[in-house]
């Protein structure tokens, strides 16, 4: 009897969303729980959105600032129908990982690297912006529970605006207008600066970030293509030996983050961001050709694809 009831529950869950994972599969949010016990449960906090930044200007840079870039900012333009004269700055990380704050001049700072995720990151962030619009200058925006249904960032951000990222050496921009920061802010600033890995955004291609972590160097490239399509293309290049960015580089795997893949190359010690510019542009051309190839994968390419798939890590 219990088994029959369980099957009914599973069938009902899949009937609500035919594209949802099987109830017994891991939830795609990365919690480690089964889908039926996480975002697939009847009392789930919010529908899980696999690609929450899709449709925003600079989708891949949003992902980079949330997941892999320690210190960076970008100015945000809101839609004309959002009733405010305040400007918004997106920050990778704010002091004490705050969701947001309103500066003394009224500027809203929105933090991307936070400790909560209620299923739709875009909705979570929009809730912070909306609360900030009602907050007096000089106050932080505290973390709260599930914001519930409401506007997403796509409803607030001007779709025709840009999203120009500025990468910083550290987090001193937090206190650029403070003569002598002290207390919790100073301690948080010191800890954040100590942990920040040197990072540079390449200029010749989009959303590729060179970084040095300890004595190792990497290039992490957030790409907007569907995961399956990109994996096929990378497999074609790998089988031909065309997935390198020149001598001293090696494609070692990829991250899965917010609905897209982030291929990662390990680099020799002497390879800087500047020396990667030309090889990265050449690789982008090869990748475009591989993405346009719709033929079936060869045996070698299927083997390469399996290897690449086994070297993925979900970080959302």
Task: State what each model feature region is.
Residues 170-280, 287, 294:
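A contiguous, surface-oriented mixed alpha/beta subdomain in the mid-to-C-terminal portion of proteins
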Residues 138-151, 165, 203-205, 244-255, ...:
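Short glycine-rich, low-complexity/disordered patches
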Residues 59-69, 116-121, 127-130, 234-236, ...:
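Short, Φ-rich (hydrophobic/aromatic) sequence segments
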Residues 1-82, 91:
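Acidic/negatively charged segments and metal-coordination signatures
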Residues 3-8, 37, 256-258, 264-316:
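C-terminal structured domains
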Residues 89-92, 108-112, 219-221, 263-265:
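Generic recognition of long tandem-repeat/solenoid scaffolds
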Residues 104-217:
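Internal, hydrophobic cores of structured domains that mediate oligomerization or house catalytic pockets
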Residues 78-107, 207, 243-244:
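Amphipathic, interaction-prone secondary-structure segments
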